[in-house]
Structure formats: C-alpha cells, structure tokens
Amino acid sequence: FTQWYMDHVMSNIAAAGHSDLTNINGFYRNQWNGLDKSPVTSLLNVDGKIGFIPGSFGIQFYQDELGQENNTMMKLGYAYTLSPFSSGTVMSLGMSVSYFSKSFGTEWIATDGWENDPAIPQDDNTSSAVDLDLGIYISKPKTFYAGLSMTHLAETEFSEMSIKPVRHLYAMGGYNYPLDGDALVLRTNILAKTDLNASAIDMGVNVLYNEMIWAGVSWRPGDAIAPIVGFQYSMINKDATNYKEQLFRLGYSFDMTTSELQSYSSGSHEVFLSYSFKFESTPILNRYANPRVL
C-alpha cells in the first residue's frame, strides 16, 4: 500500500499498541486501472493495548484479487512491550500467526489454448496454509520510529498447488521535523522490502498542518510517484471520572505509473480510513462523614 506508514502493523506486528489508542484501520486499493482483472486489495487492521498484561494485540484481515488468483489472509498477533527508556522511547517484540488461503479460477486466456497445459488449473483450485511473522519495533511518540520484521517465516507450502510463500524482510523508519512549532510538521517515511532475490523501496514525505490536514508525495523507484492528501479530526472529552479520546483519519493517494505499464494503465487509486479511540473511567470513592464532628 502507498499509505503503509499510516498503519505500521500491516508490515510489523511489533508496532501494535504504540499509539496508546485502539486503532481500526482500513485500506482499499484499485491498482493499474485500465488493465483487465487488475489487482484489487482490501485490508482491515485492529490493534490496541491489553489492559491486564504488558502488551498489545493485533488482528488483520486481508483480501487480494489478481486475474484468476484470489488470496485471503487472517492474522492474530501479540506484541510484548519492554519497559520505556528514560527518554520516553518504547521498544516492542511481536509475533503473529496467520491463516492463508489461495485459490485460482478457470477463466484462462491463452493464444495457443490452455486446456492441455498441466501448469494451468482445469478446475477451481483452493489450498490453505498456516504461517508465522516476527518483528521488533521502537518508537518515540510524534518523534521517530524504526522497525524490522520478517513474514512467512515458516514458508508453509500450499500442498495442493505446490506453491510455497517466500520469506520477506521489511525495514522501516521515519522522523518528524517540527517546522513552525506544532502548526507544521514535516513527516518522512521509508520502507525497504526484499525476499533476498528482488527488492523494492518506498520513500515518502508529507506535511501535517495544524494536526488536521496533510499533503505529500510517495515514490517507489522504477514503479510510481504518488501524490497524497489526508484529513484528521480529534476529539478529547474529560471530566472528574471519565476520559474519552477519539481520532478520525481519511487519506487518498493516486499512483502515477512510471514503469512500462504506464502505456496500459491510467494509475492506481487508494483510500485509507481510520478510527482510533481511548476510553477510561476513574471510580468514585464513597465518602462517609465522621459522626464525632457532626
């Protein structure tokens, strides 16, 4: 996703709970518009702190369609938070278990026919596998973050398809630079990913104005340049017994293809929607008068 930096948990489970809020993040991406059966990807992430233990949870639902291929994945993860450093920096270690389902359709097109090709499924074919992800993540709120993670650690094979997911390594980092007090903040982000055979990198920069509006650009060398805009609105209500914090975020990006696909694709659209919250209550202690002073 072009707006990956709005939800680090999608690439690194150890980032769960670092915002101190419970987060519900959704992404929808329509890639390479103009191509028949181009990729359509949806993702829903939920993460937050677990009150009775020093850690956080992460739940992910992922669905992707590309041509005749359909992928569905569900993840359940936990991030253990170490004691904060004196500077306010927090480090976490995370692990997630995923259930991955892959299927292929039958609407194949080939100039020389496909009926007798053993490499092309003749019927609807579905297979599933269980996998494992690990990660480490460090951050200081509103200042910087860095993380390293590995997905498909078990490389469990889809037995009915003879397909094995390949391990992927992700390294991410970012820093926020105040430009005008708290009114303007320059936010930089970078994500490098590799399966040790091929590599890709995402670099982005955006400016957040008045904690409400942001705009910027993301660049994937050899693939796309993407303008990005977004809006957020926060509400904090508190009294003697209750504290309620809510944050709404909405983002949009448009990938302008720079690869050879630009002759066939009009670009890619992506929408990000998020709701974050924190509700706390302080119990009221009963008070009794002393009859000796009545």
Locations of regions flagged by a protein language model:
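Subset of outer-membrane beta-barrel
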Residues: 1-294
